[in-house]
């Protein structure tokens, strides 16, 4: 018995593409540690790409699995809001664990927002009914 929704081929390809893109951006970020001339788009983006990647991948993975198992989109929005809250708290309130960095928090929020928009689209068009 299959309880999950059947994703369209393009949906599966797009999810893999998102994770591949995040992986490539992460690799570029870590190469930059050894060679400052290697960066993704700009040096500013390069220094915050890790938070963007983590937020985008985590929200996309959790959201995709929830959609696959027929959960409502509003549950994914709650997950996104929780991720944004955790990100903002971690980047502003816990300076003893992490350097306070509001720009890093903004990149994390942008990652979640992009993921939520993508998940809204695949919720409407990305699965066979």
Give each language-model segment a name.
Residues 1-129:
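Bulky hydrophobic segments
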């Amino acid at each position: 018995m299959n309880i999950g929704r059947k994703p369209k081929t393009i949906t599966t390809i797009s999810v893999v593409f998102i994770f591949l893109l995040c992986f490539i951006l992460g690799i570029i970020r870590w190469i930059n540690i050894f060679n400052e001339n290697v960066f993704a788009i700009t040096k500013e983006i390069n220094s915050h790409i890790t938070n963007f990647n983590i937020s985008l991948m985590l929200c996309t993975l959790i959201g995709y699995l929830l959609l696959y198992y027929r959960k409502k989109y509003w549950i994914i929005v709650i997950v996104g809001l929780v991720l944004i809250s955790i990100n903002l708290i971690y980047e502003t309130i816990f300076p003893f664990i992490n350097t306070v960095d509001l720009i890093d928090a903004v990149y994390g929020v942008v990652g979640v927002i992009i993921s939520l928009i993508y998940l809204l689209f695949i919720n409407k068009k990305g699965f066979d009914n």
